[in-house]
Amino acid sequence: MRGRILLGAALLFGLLGNLSETSAGVSNSLLDVSADGTLIACSNRDNGTVTIIERSGRKVLHEIPVGAKPEGISFLGQSHQLAVAVYADDRVVWLDADQGTRLAETPLFDEPYGVVCNAAGTRLYVTQEYPGTVAEIDAQTRQVMREIPAGSMPRGIALDEAHHRLYVTEYLTAAIVAVDLESGKVVDRWQGPSSENLARQLVLHPTRPKAYVPHIRSRVNVHQGEGSVLPFVSVADLDSKEERRRKTLPMDSFVGAFVVANPWESAISPDGKTLVSVFAGTDDGFVAEVLDDNYRELSFRRVLRLGHNPRAVKFSPDGSECYIYNALDFDLVIYDTESFNRRGQVRVCESPLSEEQLLGKRLFYSALEPMVGRRWISCASCHPDGDPDGRTWQNPEGLRNTMTLFGMAWTHPIHWSADRDEVQDFEHTIRGPLMQGQGLVRGAVHDSLGTPNSGRSADLDALAVYSNSHKFTLSPHARDGLSAAAQRGRELFQSAETRCAECHSGPFFTDSRPEKPFRLHDVGTGTEDATEKLGPKYDTPSLLGIYRSAPYLHHGKAATLEEVLTRFNHDDKHGKTSHLNPDQIADLVQFLKALPFEEPEPAAKSAKLTKVEK
């Protein structure tokens, strides 16, 4: 009998030991905890730093500068060394958490996001949103060993070492992709409806073949707030051979009529019994019991009222604590996992934003009053971190492809139809059917394009300041200068024959200016949508960053840049390209993908272009 008890204890100890060893870095997050449970690391996107926290003392040991917009972070195996994906600088930075120092950096092609490491600390896997790969990096030499194709715009990543697999989420489809590490090939895929979107992360169950993915659904034919953007956690059965291998759990009805918005991350406890999800739009978290029933999957336990814009959640390796990062409070909150009462709070960094910009960013991400009446949606639901959501919406004025906010300060007026000349005009959207909020201005809203709404509300002006703050990063296709093909494409683009540069001119490659009358153009696409109300002339969009912003045109019908130049260039209204041969079209595309190949703002200032900051 005593032998059986000892054997059982040994098996239990081995299981818990294995959970502890693999808890650091199993799935991507802005947070990670060292395998020995002594250190917490937090990636601070706005600050460009990583904060190292002593777990027992609840105090900051180091704040380490790493670069622009750090995202995923992972401890390396059992060590206190770290790797962080620096999204806007296109590199992984290696850190010593004990010393608070940078060790090295590894350049990558573009936009690293999620990071996981194997238990031995010898291999690092990093998703690259563009061009859609996972970089496998030797953690000793810090050299890229191979680039593994992993679907379209991958962000989330989780490692299943036992089965030699990576699981990756496609950001704009919320699909889960399985990659076999031996062959480096995609071997399976769990696809949801076409409306599923913005899947940044996934987490694996520690003992069962399940993956949990927080995401939204973008219902593009609905322009009322209560049905247009919906929050979900999808559960994938990784072993099932049945047709239905993915269940989607609605989070807006998980707790009766208590609506949440913008799911960001989830975490599962080391024993696999508890799942916590955070919602960055409503500043809430859900604690759920994980069920072993292959039916309901999750059972509600409690709501957590969180700080501004919670973006990360992680359990300690022993499962006794849960950590939540409130990105716009710049703090980490510690919860006891028995009761989920707060144990403590740590300020991870100071805000690098001005008070006005911080206020504007909080409003931009908020799905609460006064911005939103019914909690489902925020500005960030369609423009997360200033990016487009990859969707074409059936708006009241017609089909509208979501536009980037990058460079917007230099490219007013706003919208495809130039129907707004200042961000403050979005008070109409805040009060309208989409957001149904109380609004930020007292009294009636001035008509768009009429008397300015700027200067009427400090909150509304702050929203404008944040919205106009997004800046382009340089294209990875021109890191070493324009290629020979791009140089040929540039000559074609600027030629009098193609006439591309007549409208796509200047440092931002647009003739859009805030001075009236606005310059709108009929490029032959206005008759392709029977629901169009404001066409057929449209404002010229900037071409910067176009390499990663498909689909294209106001109606989003062009899937590629080649289609913009050929299939959708009717009667050569959108520049003259019908005479170009396939090689010339390819050269032109290479030039477009290289934009921007230099910083646009110095040239814009030299040309005395108008910058709208508020």
Spans of features found by a protein language model:
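Short coil/turn segments that connect the beta-strands within blades of beta-propeller domains
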Residues: 36-38, 78-80, 120-122, 162-164, ...
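Beta-strand-rich domains and repeat architectures in extracellular enzymes and scaffolds
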Residues: 23-49
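A short beta-strand motif characteristic of beta-propeller blades
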Residues: 59-64, 101-106, 143-148, 185-191, ...
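Short loop/turn segments that connect beta-strands within beta-propeller blades
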Residues: 54-58, 96-100, 138-142, 180-184, ...
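Periplasmic c-type cytochrome electron-transfer domains
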Residues: 24, 160, 174, 198-225, ...
